[in-house]
Amino acid sequence: MMLQISISMSVNMDTVEENIVSELRLSPIQAKVYVLVVKKGKMSTQDIAQHLNVSEDEANQAATSLIKNGGFIDITKTEFESMHPRFAIVNMYRRMCERENIPFKKNILVDNISIILEKPYDDARTKYNR
């Protein structure tokens, strides 16, 4: 029993999108857009659409919804940037709890999502890594 719990609590870059969908109750496209911008840095809807092979409208809808969910900030009407994962993931979790009328409390899996995304976020925004 204990082994199953520890396995289900693990998050890595291969499972982060599905964990975002399950724990934050975002759509798969929202999760893909969020992780992409975390990894790449500030992006336009056109860049997001090209990277994910979706329409610009789909990219814009997903990015705009991520602003409303507390994960993104808008730089311009068509450029988006992620907030730091430690803040963004908790913001999105808190908003999901409010939407779903679930008590907001500590969630180890949500914490692990933010931890796994912290390094790619920092790497994409540090000039020494470019």
Sequence positions of predicted segments:
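Short, Lys/Arg-enriched N-terminal segment that forms or immediately precedes the first helix
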Residues: 8-23
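Short, cationic-aromatic polyanion-contact patches
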Residues: 19-30, 44, 74-97
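Short helix-capping/hinge SLiMs at alpha-helix to coil transitions
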Residues: 24, 37-40
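Short alpha-helical "packing" element that flanks the helix-turn-helix/winged-helix DNA-binding module
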Residues: 30-37
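Alpha-helix C-caps/helix-loop-beta hinges
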Residues: 40, 69-70
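A short acidic, leucine-rich amphipathic alpha-helix
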Residues: 46-51
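Short amphipathic alpha-helical interaction segments
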Residues: 53-68
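Amphipathic alpha-helical dimerization/coiled-coil segments
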Residues: 92-130
